[in-house]
Amino acid sequence: MLNVENLHQYYGGSHILRGLSFEAKIGEVTCLLGRNGVGKTTLLKCLMGVIPAKEGTVKWEGKPITGFKPHQRVHAGIAYVPQGREIFGRLTVEENLLMGLSRFSAKEAREVPEFIYELFPVLEQMKHRRGGDLSGGQQQQLAIGRALASRPRLLILDEPTEGIQPSVIKEIGAVIQKLAAKGDMAILLVEQFYDFAAELADQYLVMSRGEIVQQGRGETMEADGVRGLVAI
């Protein structure tokens, strides 16, 4: 389980994250919703150690990781798919996926795990194509596949539907549901697309101005008025 307690972050004179506390449990999809500029991506960067937290603690599977560097968090079983995907455009699809195996020994990192191609068949069909030649939706699938290649216990996704065609959004949603159903991974999904989040969420969190202003179970999102809270 991911446990975040009283997390604060500042940027210049601005108080970006204001005492955030929440949990993301193994076997559940925790959806974090909020409008642009409320601090969602800053929170994820703190969780991955890209930006150090100024105050508060982050624990993963009972152990404090607040002081861990990003690569240490990867080795602890945490994977992050950022906005913009950050794939390697000049590398092939297969080479991009092999990059996700960097936390394993050379012997274990020789081949792309078969389960990646089972989740995303298009990646196997295009494994010799350069990443930069893929469509936006295919690049997003590649970015998620690369993250999953590290066999994480916590998968963090930052707005995976942004700029993606509806058919691929459905495919990504189906993959997230499959991963959650296995029950051995916590998934933290940051999303602005309400319907996508509502379909997947076991737990929801709503951020506004650096604070979590509402939280609850996914099945009560509509009754709790979450759609109105995140409407742009």
Task: Please place each PLM-identified region on the residue numbering.
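Helix-to-loop junction immediately C-terminal to a conserved catalytic motif
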Residues: 48
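Conserved ABC transporter NBD signature motif
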Residues: 56-65, 76, 109-115, 214
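Conserved catalytic motifs of ABC-family nucleotide-binding domains
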Residues: 151
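Helical segment within the ABC ATPase nucleotide-binding domain
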Residues: 170-183
